[in-house]
Amino acid sequence: EGTAAGLADVRAQLTAAGTPDAPVHILFATHSIPTRDAEAAGRSEGEPREFEEGSAYVAQHLATGAAVISRVEAESGLTAPWSLVYQSRSGAPHVPWLEPDINDAIADLAGQGIKGIVIVPLGFVSDHMEVVWDLDTEALETCRSLGLAATRVPTPGAHRKFVNGLVDLISERTSANNISDRPAMTGLGPWYDVCRPGCCANFRGGKPTIAGADSTVGTGHDAYPAGSAGAAGGEGTL
């Protein structure tokens, strides 16, 4: 709903400006993380899947973005090209993080002749400071400075459908249904409830990795021996 409404809003802005058929691009935004962490995400022993761009973190966002676009096209008939971008980079400048930064992407798209931008905060569920500052302030200001029509789609927050979805996830995990019976919105299939042993490696020595059954404090090693009930974990839905 939000993405379709955002597309309609940008189209209305362009129509008011006398350019109703000008090209529009959708940017799905999520929090950037260090490239090394992204490449290690999901790389647990025995994981059968090959992740797009070599990262479970990136693959999940790309799959979710594709699912959103498919739903928008089916329900509203609206369509536009889209891409995944990143925000909120921090840390040492010499450490590579996932790119492109949303502001760089907006500038590149403007140079390609794009006239409208729809920003979808795909990686966020509420309007906290990083959404309000990085998107509503910086990204939309970049759009204004380049003369682009733009809007930022709201996060789900306490939207009824989002809350109902959370209830469904809880119900799945408290039911006796087989994991394989859980529905999934993307080709990645049902996801794990907690990180599998060896997943999401901790590259920062001496700092704990807290991820369910994944590791002991400060070592980055498995908290449960392979094959144990604790190591097995469950699977969830993404």
Where are these regions (language model features)?
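Extended amphipathic ligand-handling, pore-lining, and cofactor/metal-binding catalytic surfaces
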Residues: E1-L238
